[in-house]
Amino acid sequence: MTESPTTSPATGSGAAAPDSDAPPYRYTAALAGRIEGSWQDTWAKLGTFNVPNPVGSLAPTDGTPVPEDKLFVQDMFPYPSGEGLHVGHPLGYIATDVYARYFRMTGRNVLHALGFDAFGLPAEQYAVQTGTHPRTRTEANVVNFRRQLGRLGLGHDSRRSFSTTDVEFYKWTQWIFLQIYNAWFDPAANKARPIAELVAEFDSGARSLDDGRNWSELSAGERADVIDSHRLVYRADSMVNWCPGLGTVLANEEVTADGRSDRGNFPVFRKRLRQWMMRITAYSDRLLDDLDLLDWPEPVKTMQRNWIGRSTGAKALFAATGADGAALDIEVFTTRPDTLFGATYMVLAPEHELVDELVAPAWPDGTDPRWTYGAATPGESVAAYRRAIASKSDLERQESKAKTGVFLGSYATNPTNGKPVPIFIADYVLAGYGTGAIMAVPGHDQRDWDFAHEFGLPIVEVIAGGDISEGAYAGDGVLVNSGYLDGLDVAAAKEAITARLEAEGRGCARVEYKLRDWLFARQRYWGEPFPIVYDSDGRPHALDEAALPVELPDVPDYSPVLFDPDDADSEPSPPLAKATDWVHVELDLGDGLKPYSRDTNVMPQWAGSSWYELRYTDPHNSERFCAKENEAYWMGPRPAEHGPQDPGGVDLYVGGAEHAVLHLLYARFWHKVLYDLGHVSSREPYRRLVNQGYIQAFAYTDSRGSYVPAEEVVERDGRFFYRGPDGEIEVFQEFGKIGKSLKNSISPDEICDDYGADTLRVYEMSMGPLEASRPWATKDVVGAHRFLQRVWRLVVDEQTGETRVVDGAGRDLPTGTLRLLHRTIAGVSEDYAALRNNTAVAKLIEYTNHLTKEHRDAVPRAAVEPLVLMLAPLAPHMAEELWLRLGHTTSLAHGPFPVADPAYLVEDTVEYPVQVNGKVRGRVTVAADADRDTLEAAALADEKVLAFLAGAQPRKVIVVPGRLVNLVV
């Protein structure tokens, strides 16, 4: 064990005890700092929080089997920014530490570790500005984060920590990429299978090509094209979010609602580029359906359901003729096939692949001028319109009240009635949803009605019940003006018209999703290189696993080519393209030594976080990303514990709700592919998810709305002032999330210096429910510190430093103390297990105050030792120190946590309110097992009740056991 740092007086009082006359052994910031540093050193030396694995380098060396009762607790790992932590960051880390410490003390084998999500744009931008390698900056930031987190006393197994930028970590990120690349999704099996099995099926004739070609007659290149089109990772010429100001392509989730980059606030343009994509859409149904198996907050599940966006409807084909005279079919998806007879025009997304083929060379005679966008030809109008909408985000396009569009000069044929319908492009139709084309039914869709009204297009009623002259009617009714559907209700009409479309070969039933495939490439430097090379024909080839890792090379500078933020026509040029010696290589991929070029894109920052939970289970394994035995132990399904449908996964995952449709969806996708391929036993990465709230603080803005440093603001007479470069100005107070952007960050180092880490831990846990946001107030931290001082005084004499407890059996405690002790044990145990740390703190304060009041001279050991043990998850340093001073020679980190005696949880007496005609007029206390007659007699004998009755006799006495007595007069 350790020598107590309290054997010397608490010199240096710190902010929490400014009085120089304070007793020499008072619990002050200085003493807390010595205690905390000492115990952190002891934990590190003894490996207190090291947890064994079933197999591998972290398995017990003596062959001892690991305990069956395990618990895997995980935090969303931090990005190591240059600013370091603020007091909002530790909220979730402390909460999970309390949870893990509690269950560790109850005897469970607890895995709790923390790594760093270290790839990303900030380090790269710093490298661009300074010429410093991003790794240098990142590693320095990680060192600072580890220092700050270390001060908090988090009980992590430090052997399991890593950064996603570690070569030995991203080697396995690349390996998992190859597993996904070398897999395809078999719809019949509803799972991923190795691509080699697909090739074998084509070779054997068990599977035929969809286009009718003969596999055996295809060239090697044609076969490769077929196989590549089935892969779960593929290249596609797709519409992407191009940000010239950042020099890279962004995922949809990285673009703000107003069409700008989430980082840097640059304009973002829709542009067609050839990019790596991951076929996450193949898993839409499983991602959606398996949400029901997860213990996650319902709002997060709802966000994922909405993001996936499953819709049931029908596909319909509208025949058209291209500008060259070729016959074309325009495919639409609709959830309302019953309204097909009301389709009076079509709208395609401006980016739709058929637009250019459908543009007529000239305007048809009689074209309405409103349809031409003021251009002389359809081609000119389309080009002008595309330029006009290039910078609009998808959200802007859909929410815009002003309807704009351009007629292509061509017509399609409505498959239900054979009538011609003009074809438009308009920005409110998105290429990424459905087929990128809609049949417009203005009589029953308000957006279509608005567009038709703006452009003078026909509006036809096909469902009776509304007034379509005033607006679209979206309600139910019977079909009218719909031929063979007339008189049917909506449900019957949907069924009938879908059957007719199928019979005529012009459509079929269809399920569509909002979810799009995952854009998986960035034109940056600081990311995982792709394990892909290209031959002289530009065809991609996966590297052999033995060639991993593909390490990042040094480059002359780290910036992608940046463009004028408004230059929508610019093209990406990644930084890795500058490393020509690295890009151009000669390799033998099985057919002799040949020249190849490496892929110069890098993976997005989401790559490492899509699987990192698995690496915690086996962080030093050089043969696999994790041993199957270790994954099965820590993450495998446990139906006996969690039910027959348990998907497995991390037992508790805590992080922000802002990751609901990014990290969490991507991680689920990767995990399901690994499960399908037999690499993991769990179907889901995270069995249980909890979203912590935010810590908020006051921020201050000047008259222009710009934020000023909160710590430099002074208050006078209810107004706030800031002294800037031009003198003092008045600023205005608002409330917001703590962070760099609001200039209101408070470092945890500051609080640790002034009060100690245990005080910070107790304060943050006492502020409110974990899931709720809560206001930070530094002035209130002292309350948590005073509570810990009271606990300290129960054990330690502040004048002498001696222990001031008295021995004695627990049964010798006063009855009131015994009952409160066991109620506290029961309540705190339930609170810790349910992450209700704020109410646990309240119960501990109540019990501490009781001991302080009832045992002024000396506290019985039997009363105070359980308090120290209960305090340990919240304030572990102080608890360890007091445990040592109470004469124990081993750490309390592994328990025992006290257990409540049920005998002391039963109340001997119960207080009943006594009502007269429904209003409380008195209260009586009776034995808990009192019968009805005893309770009635006590109520009628109460002085206040008698005074109110004034001699009247109740006509009826109502007794509700355990709740109340009501006298009716």
UniProtKB/Swiss-Prot annotation:
<keyword id="KW-0030">Aminoacyl-tRNA synthetase</keyword>
<dbReference type="GO" id="GO:0002161">
    <property type="term" value="F:aminoacyl-tRNA deacylase activity"/>
</dbReference>
<keyword id="KW-0067">ATP-binding</keyword>
<dbReference type="GO" id="GO:0004823">
    <property type="term" value="F:leucine-tRNA ligase activity"/>
</dbReference>
<dbReference type="GO" id="GO:0005524">
    <property type="term" value="F:ATP binding"/>
</dbReference>
<dbReference type="GO" id="GO:0005829">
    <property type="term" value="C:cytosol"/>
</dbReference>
<keyword id="KW-0547">Nucleotide-binding</keyword>
<dbReference type="InterPro" id="IPR001412">
    <property type="entry name" value="aa-tRNA-synth_I_CS"/>
</dbReference>
<keyword id="KW-0963">Cytoplasm</keyword>
<dbReference type="Pfam" id="PF09334">
    <property type="entry name" value="tRNA-synt_1g"/>
</dbReference>
<dbReference type="InterPro" id="IPR009080">
    <property type="entry name" value="tRNAsynth_Ia_anticodon-bd"/>
</dbReference>
<dbReference type="Pfam" id="PF13603">
    <property type="entry name" value="tRNA-synt_1_2"/>
</dbReference>
<feature type="binding site">
    <location>
        <position position="740"/>
    </location>
    <ligand>
        <name>ATP</name>
    </ligand>
</feature>
<feature type="short sequence motif" description="'HIGH' region">
    <location>
        <begin position="78"/>
        <end position="89"/>
    </location>
</feature>
<keyword id="KW-0648">Protein biosynthesis</keyword>
<comment type="similarity">
    <text>Belongs to the class-I aminoacyl-tRNA synthetase family.</text>
</comment>
<dbReference type="Pfam" id="PF08264">
    <property type="entry name" value="Anticodon_1"/>
</dbReference>
<dbReference type="InterPro" id="IPR025709">
    <property type="entry name" value="Leu_tRNA-synth_edit"/>
</dbReference>
<dbReference type="InterPro" id="IPR015413">
    <property type="entry name" value="Methionyl/Leucyl_tRNA_Synth"/>
</dbReference>
<feature type="short sequence motif" description="'KMSKS' region">
    <location>
        <begin position="737"/>
        <end position="741"/>
    </location>
</feature>
<dbReference type="InterPro" id="IPR009008">
    <property type="entry name" value="Val/Leu/Ile-tRNA-synth_edit"/>
</dbReference>
<keyword id="KW-0436">Ligase</keyword>
<dbReference type="InterPro" id="IPR014729">
    <property type="entry name" value="Rossmann-like_a/b/a_fold"/>
</dbReference>
<feature type="region of interest" description="Disordered">
    <location>
        <begin position="1"/>
        <end position="23"/>
    </location>
</feature>
<protein>
    <recommendedName>
        <fullName>Leucine--tRNA ligase</fullName>
        <ecNumber>6.1.1.4</ecNumber>
    </recommendedName>
</protein>
<dbReference type="InterPro" id="IPR002302">
    <property type="entry name" value="Leu-tRNA-ligase"/>
</dbReference>
<dbReference type="GO" id="GO:0006429">
    <property type="term" value="P:leucyl-tRNA aminoacylation"/>
</dbReference>
<dbReference type="InterPro" id="IPR013155">
    <property type="entry name" value="M/V/L/I-tRNA-synth_anticd-bd"/>
</dbReference>
